[in-house]
Swiss-Prot record:
The keyword Hydrolase applies. This is Iron-sulfur cluster carrier protein. Homodimer. One of its GO terms (biological process) is iron-sulfur cluster assembly. The lineage of its organism: Bacteria, Pseudomonadati, Pseudomonadota, Gammaproteobacteria, Pseudomonadales.
């Protein structure tokens, strides 16, 4: 439209308009060194498992990429890594090693992906103590050769223990997104997640409420299976915004299981547009 308007001006025979968007780097903790080739790190966390944190992280990364950003995702959920499956990366895929030191992330759907699952067998449980896991995770963070990323999304392990604290204190996270369901038990643990980030001076960008409502595919009846308004209550309590409220929908699960999360499997669907808005508001929250 701008190009057309300029072309229609008197004395203008032709016009060419180029728009260049530059994403600025942000770092909440000045004392922590930045990560090479990464501008902004966004941690996606939850107080407990089973609330859809990993699905949210995957769709957030893909939605950011659809906005034109260069994006990577790090699966920091050591005990239950799932990003490889969600991004359709074949079992047994291993990252290349550069200069005998750097892991080269695997690219899928336009996003760079790194996970401990790429370095271990899928059937082997991670029977490691906290300090060992923390050390391995820091090595994964600092020795991955990311390629000039605007955003690195970290899929955090659930909870608020040693692993989460180590990441929060030693990785230059710019902001965090808290994922919860409306259920009281989930909200109780989500509050602990918010408090943890506040104690280490990492901004909480907002809350994502998963499984907010279920709509019957046969009759269209809406039912709040896990309670109602929990995400809004949590956001109000801590003075942050609800970044997204997502339904309990079968297609979200099916598309993630099939290796193409909703943000790219059905990009024009109402649910995908919610993820797209989540990407925009999360990015805006860093500024």
């Amino acid at each position: 439209m701008l190009q057309m308007a300029i072309s229609n001006l008197d004395g203008v025979s032709s016009a060419k308009v180029e728009i260049n968007c530059v994403i600025a780097p942000h770092k909440a903790q000045a004392q922590i060194p930045g990560l090479a080739n990464v501008k902004n790190i966004v941690a996606v966390a939850s107080g407990k498992g089973g609330v859809g944190k990993s699905t949210t992280a995957a769709n957030l990364a893909l939605a950011l990429a659809r906005e034109g950003a260069r994006v990577g995702i790090l699966d920091a959920d050591i005990y239950g890594p799932s990003q490889g499956v969600m991004f359709g990366i074949a079992e047994g895929t291993r990252p290349k090693i550069r200069d005998q030191k750097w892991f080269v992330p695997i690219e899928a759907h336009g996003v760079e992906v790194m996970s401990m699952a790429f370095l271990t067998d899928d059937n082997t449980p991670m029977v490691w103590r906290g300090p060992m896991v923390s050390g391995a995770l820091l090595q994964l963070v600092t020795q991955t050769a990311w390629n000039d990323l605007d955003y690195l999304v970290i899929d955090m392990p659930p909870g608020t223990g040693d692993i989460q604290l180590t990441l929060a204190q030693k990785v230059p996270v710019a902001g965090s997104v808290i994922v919860t369901t409306p259920q009281d038990l989930a909200l109780l643990d989500a509050r602990k997640g918010v408090e943890m980030f506040r104690k280490v001076n990492i901004p909480v960008l907002g809350v994502v409420e998963n499984m907010a409502v279920h709509i019957c595919s046969n009759c269209g009846h809406a039912e709040h299976l896990f309670g109602e308004g929990g995400g809004e209550k949590l956001a109000t309590q801590y003075g942050v915004e609800v970044l997204a409220s997502l339904p309990l929908a079968m297609e979200i699960r099916e598309q993630a299981d099939n290796g193409k999360p909703t943000a790219i499997a059905d990009p024009n669907s109402p649910i995908a547009l919610i993820y797209q808005e989540l990407a925009v508001t999360s990015g805006r929250g860093l500024f």
